[in-house]
């Protein structure tokens, strides 16, 4: 999972966020932002992320509120013999008004509507999934729900809790970076003073 925040890119490929500075980002700014994000939990409220992570982890087809979805059946195309022309086996699953679906945690809704969720239709604020893989309408319906659960799990990933050891590590990095910054300022200041002392006799 990768999230852009200001001048920083957050990459969630490990249990902890790995912060990578953009090319135009200065080292001092990068360190200060890293410490701020980890120490102050500015990425989001801890409880919200825990709730969202637990919700995604427990998500399954049988636990979905079926009355929140609209199901439509149409005639399928492709191979299938006479059954294709006679039976409306193609299933289209729609979840309207995603932003107002209170049964989905807010943090999950934010991710689903961010453009990373392949089944999200921004214009109608809806999730639309289709399946005509089989000749059975019930099987196609089940496949729509399975696609929904699978895609949510793949798209919505949340970081684990930041340990005290990690926070301490980044505080040390910040302290070291501050010392280097002050030293650089002193060296620069001394250079300016030395240049001002040079006098030329003509």
Swiss-Prot record:
GO cellular component: mitochondrial large ribosomal subunit
Listed transmembrane segments: none
GO molecular function, one term: translation release factor activity, codon nonspecific
Coiled-coil residues: none
GO terms of biological process kind: mitochondrial translation; mitochondrial translational termination
InterPro entries noted in UniProt: Mito_Release_Factor_mL62, Pep_chain_release_fac_I
Protein name (database record): Putative uncharacterized protein YOL114C
């Amino acid at each position: 999972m990768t999230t852009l925040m200001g001048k920083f890119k957050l990459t969630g490929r490990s249990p902890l966020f790995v912060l990578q500075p953009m090319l135009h980002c200065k080292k001092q700014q990068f360190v200060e932002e890293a410490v701020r994000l980890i120490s102050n939990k500015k990425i989001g409220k801890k409880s919200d992320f825990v709730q969202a992570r637990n919700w995604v982890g427990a998500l399954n087809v049988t636990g979905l509120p079926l009355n929140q979805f609209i199901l439509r059946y149409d005639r399928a195309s492709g191979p299938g013999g006479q059954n294709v022309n006679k039976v409306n086996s193609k299933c289209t699953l729609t979840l309207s008004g995603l932003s107002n679906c209170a049964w989905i945690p807010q943090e999950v809704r934010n991710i689903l509507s961010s453009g990373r969720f392949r089944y999200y239709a921004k214009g109608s604020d809806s999730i639309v999934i289709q399946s005509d893989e089989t000749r059975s309408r019930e099987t196609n319906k089940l496949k729509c729900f399975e696609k929904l659960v699978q895609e949510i799990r793949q798209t919505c990933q949340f970081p684990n809790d930041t340990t005290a050891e990690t926070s301490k590590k980044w505080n040390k990095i910040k302290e070291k970076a501050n010392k280097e910054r002050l030293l650089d300022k002193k060296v620069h200041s001394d250079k300016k003073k030395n240049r001002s002392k040079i006098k030329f006799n003509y």
